[in-house]
Amino acid sequence: MKQKDKKTEEFYARLREQLEQDTNWPAPYMYKFIVPSELDKIAEVEAAFDGTDALIKTRDSSKGTYTSVSIRVTMDSPDAVIQKYLEVSDIEGIISL
């Protein structure tokens, strides 16, 4: 296993544990992402939440290079939260906060 994969795995294991302890599911969850300010990248993030009750807000950076995407959505479980993070992680240039 590559070092990055191991660190990613450990991060999601800690997140799952924290979400299980701190939250009664289903529950609202706030995702925050930074993506390059390209319409197709923003659309990819938004598309990952199609068919949900997601409230999506975007804001461009001061120079217009990046866009902040905040998404508030009801999730069923910690595993569902993590699955969305993994789903959007394939979008080129995305940063999950």
Describe each model-derived feature in a short phrase.
Residues M1-S68, T74-L97:
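Long, contiguous binding/interaction regions
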